[in-house]
Amino acid sequence: DVIEIQPIAEQIFEAVPSATGDRMAMGNVYVRTRAVVNYFVANAEDRVVLGTGNRAEAMTGYFTKYGDQAVDCNPIGGLYKQQVRQLAASLGVPADLVDQTPTAGMWDGQTDEAELGLDYDTVDAILALHIDGPLSTTATTRTLDGVDRSQIERVEALVAESEHKRSMPPAPSPLA
């Protein structure tokens, strides 16, 4: 079944018109609305919500907090974007879907790579070799053709700035 989330999100925008000037905030409403609908259906049908996020998205923070990572199980969460494409192709997913330009669909013309400032192949390689792997910045630039220090620093910054998205919210320790 296809459930249209736009009318639901529009109700939120009408309730808080002062916030509708922020495109990112509005896009996040769509993503969080989708999560609410997913859980509503899952609860009603005694099911679980499966995620579609990958390691590149998780590590760079390219997801909406309490939105597209609000899932019960994320079977491809440990795979880099390249690995997800390879898996999809090996399972016979049509090439037009495998090669489709990644987008969160938050607004017209939006693409993941434009927002990240790097293509996924570069992000995956930097994550695998430098962030998750043993190579220094210098060794990574020497290993990856066309990758420079600024691109590595961009990925490092994305990882650092999104740490809060990969952690439970802070809470005070219990009183002794």
Locate each region found by the language model.
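ATP/NTP-dependent adenylation/nucleotidyl-transfer catalytic domains that generate, transfer
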Residues: 1-14, 18-48, 52-55, 62-176
